Amino acid sequence: EVVYDDESMAGYMKAAVGVTPDRPILIDRFLNHAMECEADAISDGTHAFVPAVMEHIELAGVHSGDSACILPSVHISEENLETIKEYTRKIAEEMHVKGLMNMQYAIEDDKVYVLEANPRASRTVPLVSKVCNVRMVPLVTQIITSELTGKPSPVPELKEQAIPYYGVKEAAFPFNMFQEVDPVLGPEMRSTGEVLGLSKSYGEAFYKAQEG
């Protein structure tokens, strides 16, 4: 729930149910007009590799599953891209993640904020694997089974590659089937699927995703 003033906050608190010391209400400051982005990482517990950063088209506040995103990023500065990759690597290494990890960020006034660190596979893994030509799942399987197979971690050998086209992920919504669902997007996920548009043109990739 996003509230914008004291009156809305008071109304929400009155309507909240099941609030106990063990089930508190968590409050975060909302970043106004912030750009949201995310990054997936492959980590072996010591080293981490970030193939690319995905830029959300909708502003922060829309659930990442409902937001369209573009890969590689179009509007994020090189400095912020490097910051995001560095944060992702350091957090994965500090948490000793062995496998996949997804990080979500917001950028407000040219400052990068960490929103979430999820040490698990994300729905964006197929997108990143396809667009970046990185076989993320087989690589992670090799990491997880390394103690059984004796094979070394592939992470130190992974290098970021130039992406020759754009990939746009767009969410698929069930509003035509469930007409009672509020179509206004927010922090609660409403999509039931997604599609990918590919093109050497950002605009055409977005168009293909909309058509899909």
What are these regions (language model features)?
Residues 1-212:
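ATP-dependent carboxylate activation and anion-phosphoryl transfer catalytic cores
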